[in-house]
Amino acid sequence: MANNSREHLARDLFRRYEGNPILEAKDWPYPVNSVFNPAAIKLPDGTLLLARVEDLRGFSHLTLCKSKDGLSNWWIDDKPTMEADHESHEERWGLEDPRIVWLDEQGQFAITYVSFSEGGPLVSLAITKNFHTFARMGAMLPPEDKDACLFPRRFNGRFALIHRPIVQGEAHMWISMSPDLKHWGDHRVLMRTRHAFWDGQRIGLACQPIEIPEGWLIFYHGVRATVAGQIYRIGVALLDLEEPWKVLRRSPEWILGPRADYERIGDVSDVVFVTGATVNKESDLLYLYYGAADDKIAVAIANMSEIREYIMMCPEAED
């Protein structure tokens, strides 16, 4: 049943930064086709993005970008920061769609990303302390798999990974557990697509999990097929704080979708694809960084207090 007050709040949760798009191919210091789907993390001296960059052959790599305010005056690495090892079966056709978390226990950043292998897309892991050198840990799970990120801490001694395998042709979100970041098990479906809804064809994790007092905020993308093509929009769910395989609430409606021209026109039309987020605790602002129409980067801004209010207005998740 519709909830008018919740739907009004959902419609107005995010505002687009007036300087969008914040990064485009024309800003790059070397020739590229497109830039999109960045991982994001807030550091003491500003915001760091690890952007997906598609070269003129159609292969993707990752490039570092930095900004003091997370919005403007971006420094961009003058060469690819992470490139595929084309001699590796795992990374034969490029690296895509990274997410970043800080692992307190290890004192390092964990980057999950999509490697395009000979067997299809799969999820890989790299560890770094400085974003200059990277320890590539290899594939985490077999293909076909995408849209993955670790939680920043363990649960009962185990790491948790949200990811989106394709199982029997269906694209639901799963969660898996590991004692050591190498051996994964206890696989279970976390969230399913919803037939006839805006997220009825495919879903996948958006940015990294965000811890709030009520639980873990999980932003995710949903896809709906229309006669004119697919539409990628963003929703949100709330997971239990200590048992993140339990979904507490889930938004019935989308909260961010393609509306601006730069989101509706590009390499792939009608796409808002979030892969990174930062939270400013002093201003209570959430920045969602996203690929717009698969060829540029934009940011949407919301108040965390309103996000928390909204998710608690959403219905409890069905088992």
What is the predicted function of each stretch?
Residues 96:
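Acidic-residue sensor for enzyme active/binding pockets
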